[in-house]
From Swiss-Prot:
Its main location: nucleus. SUPFAM superfamilies: Cyclin-like (SSF47954). This is Sad1-interacting factor 2. It comes from the Eukaryota. GO terms for biological process: meiotic cell cycle; mitochondrial gene expression; sporulation resulting in formation of a cellular spore. Belongs to the RMD1/sif2 family. The modification Phosphoserine is found at residue 135. The gene is sif2. Required for sporulation where it is believed to have a role in meiotic nuclear division. It comes from Schizosaccharomyces pombe (strain 972 / ATCC 24843) (Fission yeast).
């Protein structure tokens, strides 16, 4: 839905792994997570099954695994009305809404399916018999080697965050777009389709090894605990919101990158005062938006009330490189701040120049008036 660059994180293109602590490992995780390198490469994964799975699952398998997708669609939601909307769909869509500070959670079903078969008989029917059979054999070999259950549970869950992001688990692309249309009435300052930011993942359930995120595949052990998915969704939602900020900063820098060069070459900005004021206003609005919504980039309140979830959230946040991206974002905002100060100085300088010319002109007029008076007096005296 977007033509933008997308999340500026290395895990989008590089095969990196982040292990997720399971429930019984929370205490061990706190002792072990002491600031060392947050990623482990494939050869460091304990257990041959997990290693083989990490090597085999790739982009060509995404269409067969359940989806996890985050959309940044607006500035914020009408939270009260949205919660009432979910409450009104208990019978038709089997909703059970719950509110956690800045997030509304609810199941939201469009049909009665509770599992999905990753090897349906009609697999890839549109690609021809040979491709279909080779795809089935490839997937079947992965399931046999990794021990993945071909019948994966479909959660069909919605996590709506107050800062304009929704994370959807277990939906098809068509169902995601259908839900986004239903969500539209609750959006404030809705983004254009081309301005929306999207993060896409896939998930599967396995009990053979530790939960983890690798190559945007989320491996979970417990299918029944939605609080784990809430923790991961918090990190994903923050990541997609950061993507929006990154794109806004990039666009602003690209639009104003010629201004410093212009000043370096000519000593002034060859723009009209109105154009300079418009540029200053745009830069100022961007800084305000990032500063006002910067709280969404911090650890959510849920991690204080449910501290057992913090290790999972921290691990997902590390995989998404949120800390590094926020630091880089702040640096680029500082650059914008410097440019803002420079433009303000240019406006002040231009204004001072105008005042100086006004004073010069007035003094010239006074001199002319004085000379005229002298000439008139001299003629009268004659």
């Amino acid at each position: 839905m977007s033509n933008r660059i997308g999340p500026q994180r290395s895990t989008k293109t590089a095969a990196k792994l982040r292990l997720l602590p399971s429930t019984e490992e929370f205490d061990d995780f706190r002792r072990q997570d002491t600031g060392r390198e947050v990623y482990s490469q494939i050869p460091q994964i304990e257990g041959s099954t997990a290693k083989r799975d990490a090597e085999h699952l790739g982009k060509r398998h995404r269409e067969f695994l359940p989806r996890v997708t985050a959309y940044c669609t607006c500035d914020t939601f009408r939270v009260d009305l949205l919660f009432k909307f979910f409450q009104s769909r208990r019978s038709s869509h089997k909703t059970r809404p719950k509110q956690f500070d800045e997030c509304i959670y609810s199941p939201y079903s469009y049909n009665n399916e509770e599992t999905t078969d990753l090897l349906p008989d009609t697999l890839e029917s549109s690609r021809g018999t040979l491709n279909r059979e080779s795809s089935q054999e490839s997937l079947q070999s992965i399931f046999e080697e990794s021990g993945l259950d071909r019948n994966q549970p479909l959660f069909r869950e919605v996590f709506c965050f107050t800062y304009g992001v929704v994370v959807l688990w277990g939906y098809t692309i068509d169902e995601e777009h259908r839900f986004l249309r239903e969500l539209g009435r609750f959006e404030i300052e809705k983004l254009k389709i081309e301005d929306m930011e999207v993060e896409e993942f896939n998930y599967y359930i396995t009990t053979l090894y530790q939960p983890r995120i690798f190559n945007d595949f989320i491996a979970l052990r417990d299918a029944s605990n939605y609080m784990i998915r809430l923790s991961i969704s918090h990190a994903i939602a923050q990541s997609v919101k950061i993507s929006l900020f990154e794109e806004l900063v990039n666009e602003t820098i690209d639009a104003t990158k010629d201004t410093p060069q212009m000043i370096a070459e000519t000593g002034r900005v060859n723009l009209k005062r109105e154009e300079i004021m418009m540029a200053v206003g745009q830069l100022f609005i961007l800084r305000i938006n990032i500063n006002l919504q910067g709280s969404v980039l911090d650890s959510p309140e849920l991690m204080w009330t449910e501290p057992q979830l913090e290790p999972i959230y921290t691990a997902a946040r590390s995989y998404l490189e949120i800390n590094q991206r926020v630091a880089l974002l702040n640096q680029r905002v500082e650059v914008i701040g410097d440019l803002l100060s420079m433009l303000k100085e240019q406006i002040t300088h231009t204004h001072d120049e105008s005042l100086e010319w006004i004073v010069v002109i007035l003094m010239g007029l006074l001199v002319l008036i004085a000379l005229f008076s002298i000439v008139v007096d001299w003629k009268l005296f004659q």
